[in-house]
């Protein structure tokens, strides 16, 4: 059973996913790499998603393990503690490939 807290977190994750998708949907990887605003917005929202994922219950993470929640949390930590050394190619791939998948899975869980 999905708890109220986990449900609220999923709704916030979806909101953050939407922001990332919106920011990268009409630009190329090159445009992204040259646009500091886009990189900052995407990284901020990835940071937020990781923080939210860290608040999910242990039971939730065990039950809904199709997504690598620990990697999401790890990316958040990498952004927070190593912003100057972030590989923006990885950030781009995450934004283009993983974030839509995460959004879809969260929506699936919520029904």
Predicted regions mapped to residue ranges:
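Solvent-exposed interaction patches of small proteins and small membrane subunits
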Residues: 1-111
């Amino acid at each position: 059973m999905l708890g109220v807290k986990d449900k609220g977190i999923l709704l916030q994750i979806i909101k953050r996913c939407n922001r990332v998708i919106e920011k990268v949907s009409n630009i190329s990887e090159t445009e992204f790499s040259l646009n500091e605003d886009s990189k900052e917005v995407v990284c901020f929202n990835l940071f937020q998603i990781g923080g939210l994922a860290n608040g999910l219950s242990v039971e939730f993470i065990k039950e809904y393990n199709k997504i690598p929640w620990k990697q999401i949390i790890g990316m958040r930590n990498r952004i927070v503690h190593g912003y100057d050394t972030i590989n923006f190619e990885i950030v781009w791939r995450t934004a283009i490939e993983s974030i839509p998948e995460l959004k879809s899975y969260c929506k699936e869980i919520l029904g």
